[in-house]
């Protein structure tokens, strides 16, 4: 029997034993264990994923051989580029229901091309995108989902992110900054409440549109757009961090609004909003600020990584979904940024290419010190949950997780990793932040590359689903997070990505905005000096 067969049988046996524990008994005849729709789907998904991961395994192949199988871990870059290009100019009539999401579609596809490193190939396409987005700008400020539509914070974020990705002078000239900021302030609501102890607490939130609903998406979209336009200030951030804290749930995650369920997308918006607030509120203000429980938030994030699949789910007891590769994955470095201050901020916004970092490492400009022993590294690598074990071995994914753990450094106070990179012509070295691995980046890459790619191009929610623009965007962004933020060897310029093949490496995304890092830097360096009178052809 093959190792994969033993592992699968052991998993089935363990599952049945667990089921028997909840079977009706004479002591409690009223209790009957029955599968829910979710547990049935979860079981089916795990079986599918296990088959994908183990289909090339044999007694003669090591776990590493299986992990690096080209049939599992090859980025279908060309097919994904073709998928994006054939959909960005013209859509089938069945897409009419997405008429109010046209700015989103542009962003999803343009950003996907950017992450794949292919956006520069078509200047005509860039010009067409800029002209279209310009037509979506509302007279009162902000952008709508299409030309002539209501100004809304969600498509405003999408339009701004697409313009940042294009990054030309024409793209920068589109935005009417004055009207945009006025519109943002019209969307803001500030209330003052009293907490136990008598403190006055200011809570600020943003409606998604005039007279619309307020939730944590609004806070994120408003502040990140203001940040990109360089008008983010204390008037806009006042009380917003308190609103995010009010949205934290008993689980530790962040809900869309106070009292709702924690969700991966809202969690990202919440932690990114705190990072944006911290950019402005560098010193403690006189106003009382509710403290968000960051440890509980991290615990909630860690528990989103699925033991068999390797990807993330967005809510407790829900299925793994490719889009959370970004929503959850990007929340880890943002959490580090909120905790770590300026050093982590430099780590997140340092503009470096893989070639730059590799050259620095080869030249001896990267110094790795205080390496811990394997047992300590295993202890610090985190808890691996729900990964089945066989009688004489581990499942493929559990092995990958443990292999990864064995290669990680302990980052406790006594065992820290110091990274120094040559940063200027005078060879002055400045230490970057010490980043702790809180999710398994290799497992995440395996999930995206092995389970979320469509053979026809594009990426998807999970096996059995069709590719779509949304999942293509966020799966690719999640892949970038796994490669550039998840493991220290990648940050230090190694090729420790799936297959260790350079052709699998995508562009680094800026996790605060979800645009390619080099595009973000170009925008932030040149936006203020842009001539607002540039004429569109």
Where in this protein do the model-derived segments appear?
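Preference for long, amphipathic alpha-helical scaffolds in soluble/luminal domains
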Residues: 1-537
């Amino acid at each position: 029997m093959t190792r994969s067969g033993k592992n699968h049988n052991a998993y089935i046996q363990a599952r049945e034993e667990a089921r028997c524990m909840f079977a009706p008994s004479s002591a409690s005849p009223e209790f009957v264990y029955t599968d829910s729709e979710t547990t049935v789907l979860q079981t089916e998904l795990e079986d599918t994923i296990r088959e994908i991961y183990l289909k090339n395994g044999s007694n003669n192949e090591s776990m590493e051989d299986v992990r690096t199988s080209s049939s599992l871990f090859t980025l279908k870059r060309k097919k994904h580029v073709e998928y994006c290009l054939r959909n960005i100019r013209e859509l089938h009539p069945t897409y009419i229901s997405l008429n109010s999401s046209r700015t989103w579609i542009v962003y999803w596809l343009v950003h996907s091309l950017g992450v794949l490193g292919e956006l520069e190939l078509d200047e005509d396409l860039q010009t067409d995108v800029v002209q279209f987005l310009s037509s979506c700008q509302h007279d009162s400020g902000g952008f709508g989902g299409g030309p002539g539509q209501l100004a809304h914070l969600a498509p405003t974020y999408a339009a701004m992110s697409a313009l940042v990705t294009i990054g030309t002078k024409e793209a920068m000239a589109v935005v009417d900054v004055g009207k945009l900021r006025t519109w943002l302030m019209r969307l803001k609501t500030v209330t003052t409440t009293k907490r136990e102890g008598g403190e006055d607490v200011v809570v600020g939130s943003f409606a998604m549109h005039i007279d619309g609903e307020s939730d944590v998406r609004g806070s994120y979209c408003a502040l990140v757009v203001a940040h990109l336009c360089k008008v983010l200030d204390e008037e806009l951030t006042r009380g917003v961090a308190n609103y995010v804290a009010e949205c934290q749930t008993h689980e530790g995650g962040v809900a869309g609004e106070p009292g709702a369920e924690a969700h991966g997308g809202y969690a990202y918006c919440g932690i990114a909003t705190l990072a944006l607030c911290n950019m402005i509120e560098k010193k403690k203000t006189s106003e009382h600020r509710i403290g968000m429980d960051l440890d509980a938030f991290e615990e909630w994030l860690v528990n989103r990584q699925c033991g068999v699949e390797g990807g993330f789910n967005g809510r407790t007891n829900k299925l793994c979904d490719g889009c959370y590769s970004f929503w959850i994955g990007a929340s880890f470095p943002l959490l580090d940024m909120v905790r770590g201050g300026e050093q982590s901020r430099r780590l997140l916004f340092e503009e470096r290419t893989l070639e730059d970092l590799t050259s620095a490492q080869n030249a001896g400009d990267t110094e790795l010190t205080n390496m811990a022993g394997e047992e300590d590294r295993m202890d610090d690598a985190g808890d691996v949950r729900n990964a089945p074990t066989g009688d004489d071995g581990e499942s493929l994914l559990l092995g990958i997780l443990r292999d990864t753990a064995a290669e990680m450094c302990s980052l406790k106070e006594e065992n820290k990793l110091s990274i120094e990179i040559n940063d200027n012509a005078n060879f002055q070295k400045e230490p970057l932040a010490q980043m702790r691995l809180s999710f398994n980046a290799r497992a995440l890459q395996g999930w995206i590359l092995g389970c979320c790619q469509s053979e026809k191009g594009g990426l998807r929610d999970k096996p059995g689903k069709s590719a779509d623009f949304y999942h293509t965007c966020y799966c690719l962004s999640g892949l970038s997070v796994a490669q550039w933020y998840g493991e220290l060897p990648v940050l230090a310029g190694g090729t420790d990505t799936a297959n260790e093949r350079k052709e699998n490496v995508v562009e680094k995304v800026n996790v605060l905005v979800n645009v390619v890092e080099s595009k973000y830097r170009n925008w932030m360096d040149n936006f203020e000096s842009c001539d607002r009178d540039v004429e569109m052809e």
